[in-house]
């Protein structure tokens, strides 16, 4: 058992929550000294927010690469060291790495002489000082909504943690002190005040605005305008929420010097973002979409995007992670039930929590919305079986939504009663087991079996 696990068991939970960030802070300082401050002279773009971080970061990194820059990217789904070998899966299950692993990665990145590092930055990483010493040149903010309350406890603490990114960027004398902020978000003013050079974006408001918006199942087209500049945008990323993600990337790209052609071509040339609204097509006569949506707001946005393009029934498969924002479970259940014809609840990283209890908490919201157990509400704990059931139920014109996992490569389960097998990894720090799993592969397997 790790030292952290021992300390966590000895001292009260509330006290541990108070002292833990200081431990991370001290750790970050010591490790920066030990590594020789590898972040020095590195140009870093940080993006934070509840939703949209990964898509905005991936899109921005792609635009910079297409414009001739050497770019490294660290995101929820992948890490690209800027060595020309492309992204590797981020199997740590952490959007922002701990300071030691972060600095290890940065040493590799710096050796590759990159022009930019795009760093997806979470509220937990900020509040735990994991990113202490990161010289943010430009920062971006997507939105703030219901998530991570399991850690921050209150919305105000969550918001203050996000604000730390802007304060850190504003302290960087060598940086541009630019913050690109979603002005359509209710909390935008809070962040605008914290940065010397704010640039706002939005559909309803902002310095950078999207007009002439046309949404389709295959993406969107719109005009992005700021000052006297206009960008004719064609995006392959469907959904109104991806218009916001594109605007965030445009605002940052423009700030660091990309021109009109580079911005337009950069967006148009990105075909998809791994685990975000990805279609699985094996020649079947119904749709299958894999998406990482895992908050009430993300559910709202996703259903708003897919309902207009679905002729048949919507079958939604999802769960909720153990020890993570338990308040959202019935809320997501109700949203999904109101927008789906059939709900199949399943595992999504139970960790050390009882899986059936998690499903029952989601089911409370599903039942509230009118679904009936055994009829249009099913519970199938093993995720592979739930995916197969949904695909077997689908008819011509239907849509199967596989939500919450995206392109993650493991499922975290609790240790008691679980039989370990080859490929399973025991995590001593959390007393859990990771077993290999990929949503797209699971869907392909079920679809191929259906064809036979």
Question: Language-model segments: what does each one mean?
Answer:
Residues 3-183, 189-196, 247, 253, ...:
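Phosphate-binding loop of NTP-binding sites
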Residues 96-103, 159, 243-246, 296-299, ...:
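Amphipathic alpha-helical transducer elements in NTP-driven molecular machines
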């Amino acid at each position: 058992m790790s030292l952290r696990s021992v300390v966590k068991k000895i001292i009260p939970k509330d006290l541990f929550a108070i002292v833990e960030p200081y431990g991370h802070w001290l750790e970050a300082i010591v490790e920066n000294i030990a590594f020789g401050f590898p972040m020095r002279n590195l140009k870093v773009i940080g993006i934070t927010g509840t939703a949209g971080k990964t898509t905005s970061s991936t899109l921005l990194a792609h635009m910079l690469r297409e414009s001739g820059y050497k770019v490294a990217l660290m995101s929820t789904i992948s890490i690209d060291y800027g060595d020309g070998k492309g992204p590797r899966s981020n199997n740590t299950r952490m959007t922002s790495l701990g300071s030691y692993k972060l600095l290890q990665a940065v040493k590799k990145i710096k050796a590759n002489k990159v022009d930019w590092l795009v760093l997806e930055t979470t509220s937990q990483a900020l509040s735990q000082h994991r990113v202490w010493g990161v010289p943010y040149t430009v920062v971006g903010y997507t939105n703030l909504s219901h998530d991570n309350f399991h850690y921050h406890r209150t919305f105000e603490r969550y918001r203050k943690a996000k604000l730390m990114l802007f304060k850190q960027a504003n302290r960087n004398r060598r940086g541009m002190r630019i913050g690109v902020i979603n002005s359509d978000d209710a909390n935008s003013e809070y962040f605008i005040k914290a940065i010397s050079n704010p640039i706002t974006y939005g559909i309803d408001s902002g310095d950078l605005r999207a007009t002439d918006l046309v949404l389709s199942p295959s993406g969107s087209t719109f005009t992005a305008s700021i000052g006297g500049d206009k960008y004719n945008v064609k995006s392959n990323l469907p959904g109104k929420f991806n218009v916001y993600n594109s605007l965030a990337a445009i605002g940052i790209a423009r700030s660091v010097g990309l021109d009109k052609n580079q911005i337009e071509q950069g967006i148009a040339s990105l075909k998809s973002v791994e685990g975000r609204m990805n279609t699985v097509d094996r020649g079947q006569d119904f749709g299958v979409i894999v998406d990482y949506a895992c908050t009430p707001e993300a559910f709202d946005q996703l259903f708003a995007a897919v309902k207009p393009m679905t002729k048949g029934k919507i079958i939604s498969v999802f769960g909720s992670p153990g020890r993570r924002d338990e308040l959202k479970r019935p809320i997501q259940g109700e949203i999904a039930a109101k927008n789906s014809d059939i709900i199949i609840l399943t595992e999504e990283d139970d960790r050390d929590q009882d899986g059936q209890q998690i499903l029952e908490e989601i089911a409370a919201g599903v039942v509230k919305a009118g679904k009936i157990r055994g009829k249009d509400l099913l519970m199938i704990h093993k995720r592979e079986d739930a995916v197969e059931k949904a695909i077997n139920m689908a008819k011509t014109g239907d849509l199967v939504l596989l939500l919450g996992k995206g392109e993650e490569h493991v499922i975290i389960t609790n240790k008691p009663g679980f039989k370990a097998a080859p490929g399973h990894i025991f995590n001593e720090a959390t007393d859990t087991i990771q077993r290999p799993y990929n949503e797209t592969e699971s869907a392909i397997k079920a679809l191929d079996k259906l064809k036979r």
